[in-house]
């Protein structure tokens, strides 16, 4: 197994460190997590049914092994109180009442959530929702787990999509915490215990001048979509290396255009369709005209912010830039061929000017910001 596959294997473990219904049974949540890990593990040797999870995964001590990313994610996604019991007055209720309150992270809004009757019932629903996730590699499996588990769970019970990560501070979902934990796991220094995260801000431009050149509504849409598509390709270059959970902004899960740049992963997942005809996950998601409309929405902005390993920040930025240049050249070459077909004559003399224009657009800028090792150095920066 190469280093990237080993990393994604660890990220799957980190992602599953908490079960999505943890808030319904805090005392048993570690056992629930192990149950999910056992159910989805793709490196399953023959006769592994009786193996302990630690033996199955090759992780000597499952929870101590990944608490550093868990603690980093907890610090990032919630307000830290002076002690563990502070702030308990605003708790998410459940389990006996089967009702809980989740709060908006930026405002005073609240929402009542009707929870599954028991934690065991929630586990059953969650197990059933990812039973069909199969993949050939840990990278693809992590992508599908990140992309589909929450969505499939919500289809069974909408409450499973919004259960909070912390019963004392119910203003962010467990899924956000799982995403961040996996993202921090990818930031381990050389695969060791120490985390070395950094922010990567990547941007295409100039957007206003490019959009202003539109002479029709169709031009306006085409320009917006091109920028959105190219940014999606840049994001894919990063997420292929460290997973989609690493992207802080924009929120990628469920965006049609991001699914489109990752189409090959969806098409590898096969099902039995109607009349026993082969079907793919891509067809199930976007096989209808109504669903396919979302593929034409330019929903990715011209920039993204990602949590990346500090030691690889520049490399990942370069990968993203190269992906944009490569995709724009592919699109440009196709357009040039079509232009030649429409002109019905030799236009090869136009090629140098055509390529020069492609070199000038877009302007790509990126910036990295490594996290400081301690509070004093962070405050001094």
What are these regions (language model features)?
Residues 1-381:
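Regulatory and interdomain segments flanking nucleotide-handling catalytic cores
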């Amino acid at each position: 197994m190469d280093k990237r596959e080993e990393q994604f294997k660890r990220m799957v473990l980190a992602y599953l460190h908490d079960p999505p219904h943890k808030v319904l049974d805090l005392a048993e949540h570690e056992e629930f997590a192990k149950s999910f890990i056992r159910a989805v593990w793709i490196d399953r040797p023959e006769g592994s049914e009786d193996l302990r999870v630690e033996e199955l995964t090759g992780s000597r001590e499952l929870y101590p092994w990944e608490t550093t990313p868990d603690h980093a994610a907890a610090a990032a996604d919630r307000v830290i109180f002076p002690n563990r019991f502070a702030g308990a007055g605003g708790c998410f209720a459940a389990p006996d009442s089967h009702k809980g309150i989740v709060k908006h992270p930026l405002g005073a809004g609240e929402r009542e959530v009707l929870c599954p009757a028991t934690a065991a019932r929630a586990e059953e629903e969650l197990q059933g929702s990812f039973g069909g996730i199969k993949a050939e590699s840990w990278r693809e499996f992590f992508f599908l787990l990140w992309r589909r588990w929450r969505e499939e769970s919500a289809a069974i019970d909408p409450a499973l999509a919004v259960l909070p990560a912390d019963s004392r501070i119910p203003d962010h979902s467990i899924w956000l915490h799982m995403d961040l934990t996996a993202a921090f796991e990818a930031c381990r220094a050389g695969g060791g215990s120490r985390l070395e995260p950094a922010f990567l801000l990547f941007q295409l431009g100039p957007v206003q001048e490019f959009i202003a050149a539109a002479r029709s509504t169709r031009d306006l849409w085409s320009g917006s979509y091109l920028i959105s598509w190219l940014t999606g390709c840049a994001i894919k270059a990063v997420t292929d290396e460290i997973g989609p959970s690493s992207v802080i902004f924009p929120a990628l899960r469920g965006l049609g255009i991001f699914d489109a740049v990752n189409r090959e992963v969806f098409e590898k997942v096969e099902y039995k369709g109607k009349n026993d005809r082969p079907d793919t996950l891509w067809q199930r998601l976007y096989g209808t005209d109504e669903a396919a409309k979302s593929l034409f929405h330019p929903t990715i902005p011209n920039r993204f912010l990602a949590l990346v390993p500090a030691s690889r920040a520049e490399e990942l930025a370069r990968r993203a830039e190269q992906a944009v240049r490569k995709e724009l050249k592919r699109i440009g070459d196709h357009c040039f061929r079509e232009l030649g077909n429409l002109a019905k004559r030799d236009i090869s003399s136009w090629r140098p000017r055509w390529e020069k224009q492609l070199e000038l657009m877009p302007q790509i800028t990126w910036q990295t910001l490594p996290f400081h090792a301690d509070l004093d150095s962070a405050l001094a920066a």
